[in-house]
Amino acid sequence: MDMIETKALEFAYPAEEGEKPVLALRGVDTAIEKGSFVVVLGHNGSGKSTFAKCLNAILLPCGGKVYVEGMDTQDEACLLEIRRRVGMVFQNPDNQIVANVVEEDVAFAPENLGVASEEIRRRVDDALAAVDMTAFMTHAPH
């Protein structure tokens, strides 16, 4: 089974009043094997980010299907598990900072995965120590 598979994937951004929807993806078929490395290349506005957001269900297709390890991104019951498997690093760091201090930002992911508070504390401390950032624990993340 492929790690990620798309079948005739389509996505259109909603239209402004009086305009047509903007079709960003049309008929995208992809099969990505677990452990493989994939590069998505294209000009600005060609749909690369839209495609990536469809893979982890930040955006849902308006046509076709996206499967992550066999789970359909349009199945609400699978969304958390899909997002555990397909992460995203945004191009602009400001779009991924979610807290006012470094330690809270580092804790965000395990909190959303339901990790116990004591374990989150240990993981945050270990992660900051591993990159020599313990002194910045209570600083703003930017």
Positions of PLM-derived features:
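Conserved ABC ATPase "signature" region
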Residues: E118-M137
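Short helical segment in ABC ATPase nucleotide-binding domains corresponding to the A-loop/adjacent helical element
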Residues: D94, N100-E111, R121, D125
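Helix-to-loop junction immediately C-terminal to a conserved catalytic motif
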Residues: N56
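Signature (C-motif/LSGGQ) region and adjacent switch/coupling loops
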Residues: A99, E103, M137-A140
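The feature captures the beta-strand-to-loop junction immediately N-terminal to the Walker
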Residues: L41-H43
